[in-house]
């Protein structure tokens, strides 16, 4: 059901203007930029997209704009997860209406829901998605929900689930999931261990830094398919040098600043309470943007 979703999927950023409103023109440019750099698909409205500081209406607008720009060109996954099941269902129905290829949802967070309540939450969203495969989103560091291997097994075998976004540094668990579920589409979620995640069994990845250097991650996939571990490791090291800088600056605002210097995003701001990049990092981010543009050609 979801085998066509394998690949390198950029976790799409959401541009805002100086007044903190959606910057629709920059969003359209960013979608086209990702298409042009050879990304297999987009993961829209997730953590990188600052979904949880947007209204439901804004999240629907983002889905609609992305579909207008990219439907039929690359694969589109709509992250529809909310704490509220009803709101998640509303977004899932919108994703279906706009022509997305799949939906995804983070485990419901903040309140200490039981595991059965998690399962009911996913079943309801899957029902509202009306045939679109579900990508379960496991990100314990941000959700606070630490799923056991048995719980992951249960979630990924729910009717309608076709994939798992595994944003965890536990490569042993990644391998265990692959061993138990050989046909499951499995995404690596942490960019800094992309190559290792592929070796542990991931089919591809969903990541934020793909927005500025997606071709490097495609290069890692190609190298590993050819058995060239040395090249894959070299590319991963180059990616991680960038990630080192972004961690210092704040990843999302750092990425937006690089894209601003690439003339893709007009305003390099995240939505409050996120603040701007510290000015002391701007020269490094500008140099990085120039380096990546030259490398991309």
UniProtKB/Swiss-Prot annotation:
Pfam families: DHDPS. Keywords: Carbohydrate metabolism, Cytoplasm, Lyase, Schiff base. PROSITE patterns: DHDPS_1, DHDPS_2. Aceneuramate binds at residues 47-48, 167, 189, 191-192, 208. Signal peptide: none annotated. It is found in: Cytoplasm. The active site is at 137 (proton donor), 165 (schiff-base intermediate with substrate). Homotetramer. This is N-acetylneuraminate lyase 1. The lineage of its organism: Bacteria, Pseudomonadati, Pseudomonadota, Gammaproteobacteria, Enterobacterales.
């Amino acid at each position: 059901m979801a085998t066509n979703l394998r690949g390198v999927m950029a976790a799409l950023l959401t541009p805002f203007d100086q007044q903190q409103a959606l910057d629709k023109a920059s969003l359209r440019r960013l979608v086209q930029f990702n298409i042009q750099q050879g990304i297999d698909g987009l993961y829209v409205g997730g953590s990188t997209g600052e979904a949880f500081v947007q209204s439901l209406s804004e999240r629907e607008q983002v889905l609609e704009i992305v579909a207008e720009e990219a439907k039929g060109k690359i694969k589109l996954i709509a992250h529809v997860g909310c704490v509220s099941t009803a709101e998640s269902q509303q977004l899932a129905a919108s994703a279906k209406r706009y022509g997305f290829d799949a939906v995804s949802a983070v485990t419901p967070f903040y309140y200490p829901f039981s595991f059965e309540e998690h399962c009911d939450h996913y079943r309801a969203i899957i029902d509202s998605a009306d045939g679109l495969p579900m990508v379960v989103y496991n990100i314990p560091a941000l959700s606070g929900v630490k799923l056991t291997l048995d719980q992951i097994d249960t979630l990924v075998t729910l009717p309608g689930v076709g994939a798992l976004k595994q944003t965890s540094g536990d490569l042993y668990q990644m391998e265990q999931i692959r061993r138990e579920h050989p046909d499951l589409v499995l995404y690596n979620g942490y960019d800094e261990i992309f190559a290792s995640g592929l070796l542990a069994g991931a089919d591809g990845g969903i990541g934020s830094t793909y927005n500025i250097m997606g071709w490097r991650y495609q290069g890692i996939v190609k190298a590993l398919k050819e058995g060239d571990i040395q090249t894959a490791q070299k590319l991963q090291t180059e990616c991680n040098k960038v990630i080192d800088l972004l961690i210092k600056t704040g990843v999302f605002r750092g990425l937006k600043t690089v894209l601003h210097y690439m003339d893709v995003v007009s305003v390099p701001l995240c939505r409050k309470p996120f603040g701007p990049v510290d000015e002391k990092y701007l020269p490094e981010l500008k140099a990085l943007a120039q380096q990546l543009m030259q490398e991309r050609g």
